[in-house]
Amino acid sequence: DYDYMTSEIDSLIPTSYTINNDTYALVIGNQNYRFVPGVPYAIHDARVFKEYCEKTLGIPSENIHLVEDGTKAMINEEEFQWLENISNRENKKLIVYYAGHGVPDTKDRNKAYMLPTDVRGTKPQNGISLNDFYGRIGDLAFEQTSVFLDACFSGINRDNESVNEGMRGTE
């Protein structure tokens, strides 16, 4: 695990007295990866984002799904099933937050992927394509959707280690 340094932004979360029953949030924090170096603080950041959703945005906790160390199946199947089961989506809002590895496609610079915790960095195409992810989110037809990606998509982590095994970063 990581030694967390907290700041005021983590603890002095503004509180609103508004309740937004028609807003939902899918919050994903991928920190501990099976095949590639981890993403320090991703779970912590996801938990803090969830807390902001509850306290500041007034989203009821039952309208928020927090996924920690999400596998491809968890994200593609379980979480999208949860979103699909929300009725009257055309009158509701969705917020999606992802903290974790983003991986570029080494063959096509116009493609990028979110890396679930059970996918190898050598085959980013086995991850979750951003184009497909945005398409699926759009097909859900919420009234409004906001997506926050806390991922760099360079293929290199903070320690200059490659997420795409067999490659390394340069300075």
Predicted regions and their residues:
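Short, intrinsically disordered, charge-balanced linker/junction segments flanking boundaries
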Residues: 165-171
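Boundary/activation segment at the start of structured domains
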Residues: 1-112
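Alpha-helical scaffolding within the catalytic cores
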Residues: 8-13, 131-132, 170
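Caspase-like (clan CD) cysteine peptidase catalytic core
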Residues: 22, 76-99, 103-162
